[in-house]
A protein has these predicted regions:
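N-terminal Rossmann-like NAD(P)+-binding domain of SDR-like oxidoreductases, especially those catalyzing
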Residues: 1-178
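Single conserved hydrophobic/aromatic residue that forms the stacking wall/gate
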Residues: 175-187
Length: 187
């Protein structure tokens, strides 16, 4: 297994949305162990017990419980953190739930992305933004190999479609707010 040199993150201020979820918890643990100064912003953990609780992530990061749809609280938390790196994982990730409540899914996955990108746009501290989505953003062609980033976006269900929209919002921000000398936006 390849070993990664994580020394780059030593002392870096990193803002992680969705830090109480499974992926976000592991990401925060790795970043904290690498010496990053991590601020997490998320809803309460979705299960109890959760990895976030079991691994005691709150001890490793500045944990803020908040809703990505609440721009005022998000912005206040973001401004206080003054991050150099933003890793956006916050989402409504359950396909079945997206059918039951599509409005909430779109509000969280699309407008939540808009909200965090507005925080980035209105700051001078961020150098890198990563929007973590899913392979479900691509048109499902039922083939045996994995999808590539140049595949056609689609979204057959509200979850997948909302994550495709999130990709498009990030792409638009790349065109309109990204300054090559200051900020890299990646989705």
């Amino acid at each position: 297994m390849k070993q990664f040199d994580l020394s780059f993150y030593q002392g870096k201020k990193v803002f992680v949305t969705g830090h109480t979820g499974f992926k976000g918890s592991w990401l925060c643990k790795v970043l904290a162990n690498a010496g990053a100064i991590v601020t997490g912003y998320s809803l309460n953990p979705p299960t109890s017990p959760s990895l976030f609780e079991i691994a005691d992530i709150a001890q490793d990061v500045h944990s803020v419980i908040g809703d990505i749809r609440d721009y005022a609280t998000l912005k206040a938390t973001f401004d206080a953190a003054q991050p150099e790196i933003v890793l956006h994982l916050a989402a409504q990730p359950i396909v079945r739930d997206s059918y039951k409540n599509p409005a909430y899914t779109y509000e969280t996955n699309v407008m939540g992305t808009v909200n965090i990108l507005e925080c980035v746009r209105n700051s001078n501290c961020v150098k890198s933004f990563l929007n973590v989505t899913t392979d479900k953003v691509y048109l499902n062609k039922e083939w045996a190999w994995g999808y590539r980033e140049n595949e056609e976006l689609d979204g057959f269900d509200p979850y997948s479609n909302s994550k495709s929209c999130s990709e498009l919002v990030t792409h638009l921000s790349l065109i309109h707010i990204s300054e090559p000398t200051r900020l890299a936006l990646i989705s």
